Design a protein with these regions (language model features):
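Active-site core segments that coordinate phosphate-bearing ligands/cofactors
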Residues: 2-16, 21-29, 40-43, 47-48, ...
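Gly/charged, well-structured mid-domain segments that form the phosphate/adenylate-handling core
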Residues: 68-73
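Core-facing hydrophobic residues within beta-strands of well-ordered domains
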Residues: 62-64, 244
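Nucleotide/phosphate-binding loop and acidic/charged catalytic motifs
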Residues: 30-36
Length: 320
C-alpha cells in the first residue's frame, strides 16, 4: 500500500486485540512489546520501533502506537458503576510459554498442528533462530513452524482413505495409530515430514522401504522419530551447550501421544514433564494477572507461585 501511495498519513497500525481494547476504553491504541514483535518492525534490543526500517519502507507517515511497559494500564472500561482497568494485549506465544511455567533451565517443546522449540534467556543471544521479547525484560529464543500435526494428518488421510471412501463407520484413527507405533520395532524405515515449507525443508519423503518393514506402525514410528530428530537438531541451535535440565511438553499432540513423548525422550536422553494444564495460554494469563495486579512482584514470581500450586502435576518423568 505504501508503494502505491494508498496509505493515509497518521493512520494507526494496530492489532485486532489492541483495537478492541482501545474501542472499549475510548483510548488511543497502544501495544505491548510481545505483540509488537508480530509487526516485524520491532528493535528487540531496545523494545522500541525500528525507525530506520520504518523509514526505508516508507511507513514513517503512519502514527505508530506507543509501546507500553509491562503491566501498564492503558484504559478503563466502565461496567455498571465500576471502572475496570484494562491492559495491553500480549503475544499468545509468550503467554503460552508463561503458562508452561517454563524456567531458564528447561527446554520447551510445544507440539500441536505445528510445533516450536523454545527457551527463555536473560540476555539477547543471536543465532539461527528467532529472538522474541518475553516478560520481565527477558527473551525467548525459538524455532517455529516445525512439522507436527498438520504433516501427520497427511499420513493419517493416506492410511484411512479406503475405509472413508467405502463409507465405513468412523473410528478413532489416532488411538490405533499411536498403539501401532508403540508396538512397532525400529525397522530402518525413514520418514521426512517436511511436506510443507518450513525450517526443515518442503519435500517430505518415505524411504528405506523394504519388503517387510512398511506397516502403519513402522510408518508412524518413523514419523515420530523424524519429529524427535528435528527437535534435537533445533534444540542444539537455540541451546548450543545442550545444558537444559529437562523438557517441558505442551500442546494437544504432545499431551495426547505418549509414544511420541517417549521417542523424543529417548532422542534427548533427558527427563521431561507436561504442562500443568491443557490450556497453557490461559494459565499464562493467570500468571500475568497475578503480576499486573501487583499480587506478585514479577511474572517470574507469579510462575513460581503457580509451580508450587500445581506441584503435583509437574512431576518429572526420567528415562527408563
Amino acid at each position: 500500500m505504501a508503494e502505491r501511495k494508498q496509505l493515509q498519513p497518521n493512520f494507526i497500525p494496530v492489532s485486532l486485540a489492541d483495537f478492541v481494547i482501545s474501542s472499549l476504553c475510548n483510548s488511543r491504541p497502544t501495544v505491548d512489546s510481545t505483540n509488537a514483535m508480530a509487526y516485524e518492525l520491532l528493535d528487540v534490543t531496545t523494545s522500541q520501533w525500528h525507525d530506520e526500517v520504518i523509514r526505508d519502507l516508507s511507513l514513517d507517515k503512519l502514527s505508530w502506537p506507543s509501546i507500553c511497559s509491562q503491566g501498564e494500564i492503558v484504559g478503563q472500561l466502565q461496567f455498571g458503576d465500576r471502572m475496570v482497568p484494562c491492559y495491553t494485549a500480549v503475544g499468545d506465544y509468550q503467554c503460552a510459554l508463561a503458562g508452561a511455567l517454563l524456567d531458564e533451565s528447561e527446554l520447551s517443546l510445544n507440539i500441536s498442528t505445528g510445533s516450536q522449540v523454545s527457551r527463555i534467556t536473560e540476555q539477547i543471544q543471536s543465532g539461527q533462530y528467532q529472538t522474541r521479547p518475553f516478560f520481565d525484560g527477558k527473551f525467548a529464543n525459538t524455532i517455529s513452524h516445525l512439522p507436527a500435526g498438520r504433516s501427520l494428518n497427511v499420513l493419517v488421510d493416506l492410511v484411512t482413505e479406503i475405509p472413508r471412501s467405502l463409507g465405513m463407520p468412523e473410528f478413532d484413527a489416532w488411538e490405533y495409530l499411536a498403539k501401532a507405533a508403540e508396538q512397532a520395532d525400529r525397522s530402518g524405515l525413514r520418514v521426512n515430514l517436511g511436506f510443507f515449507p518450513g525450517p526443515r525443508g518442503n519435500q517430505g519423503a518415505i524411504s528405506e522401504i523394504r519388503e517387510r518393514n512398511l506397516s502403519v506402525g513402522t510408518l508412524f514410528r518413523g514419523a515420530f522419530e523424524n519429529m524427535a530428530e528435528n527437535y534435537s537438531e533445533c534444540a542444539g541451535l537455540i541451546w548450543p551447550d545442550r545444558s537444559w535440565k529437562s523438557i517441558v511438553f505442551s500442546g494437544g499432540l504432545a499431551r495426547k501421544l505418549k509414544t511420541l513423548r517417549t521417542i523424543i525422550q529417548e532422542q534427548f536422553s533427558t527427563p521431561y514433564r507436561l504442562c500443568a494444564l491443557e490450556e497453557d495460554t490461559l494459565l499464562g494469563l493467570m500468571a500475568l494477572a497475578l503480576a499486573f495486579s501487583k499480587r506478585t512482584a514479577s511474572v517470574e514470581e507469579a510462575m513460581k507461585a503457580l509451580r508450587t500450586h500445581y506441584a503435583d502435576r509437574l512431576r518429572t518423568i526420567s528415562n527408563t
